[in-house]
């Protein structure tokens, strides 16, 4: 088994020039050629940013609605009350509630991928913050998941909204599609993501903003991308 895996990886690595930083178009082409799993692998971008997340003014966090979605069916939970619950249901939310939903979460219910809440429900959401936070599910105004416009937020989530935030080491990871996507769709999704991240560059960040960038599939090696080309995307 190990020998078979090694041979598969060796074959994949042979398709990549490790000392080369690929342009977006060629990078996408190479990554698609690496698809070898028996399932539709996720395409992921990883960016190393020139920021220090220990400083609040250098925390990069946001959301982007990819033009072609992620290829994943997203289940959405909404904390709301009264008419806003009806708006959430009509928009296609999978789970809608208030205190009752918080209790279900406390009892182990986490069968959703994104949580949205109206501002007046954040006190209720806070009761399960220790559960949602570590899973990256806590609603936040910066990602548009704390809002009174519930219908739009649910629509964005269902259409392929990707929430991202820089980690402690300055890295941002985000899915931008599936290996089965046409190259053009993967490229357009990546450009939209990078454009959004570039717009969020902190004014206090010094030096090169995108230090390193890679593109990969779930089961593939990473392909180095031209960081300068990405920084020039506006």
Curated annotation (Swiss-Prot):
It holds the Pfam family Ribosomal_L1. The keyword Transferase does not apply. One of its GO terms (biological process) is regulation of translation. GO terms for molecular function: rRNA binding; structural constituent of ribosome; tRNA binding. InterPro entries: Ribosom_uL1_bac-type, Ribosomal_uL1, Ribosomal_uL1-like, Ribosomal_uL1/biogenesis, Ribosomal_uL1_3-a/b-sand, Ribosomal_uL1_CS. Keywords: Repressor, Ribonucleoprotein, Ribosomal protein, RNA-binding, rRNA-binding, Translation regulation, tRNA-binding. Transmembrane segments: none annotated. The keyword tRNA-binding applies. Disulfide bonds: none annotated. One of its GO terms (cellular component) is cytosolic large ribosomal subunit. Binds directly to 23S rRNA. The L1 stalk is quite mobile in the ribosome, and is involved in E site tRNA release. Protein L1 is also a translational repressor protein, it controls the translation of the L11 operon by binding to its mRNA. Belongs to the universal ribosomal protein uL1 family. Part of the 50S ribosomal subunit. This is Large ribosomal subunit protein uL1. It comes from Helicobacter pylori (strain Shi470).
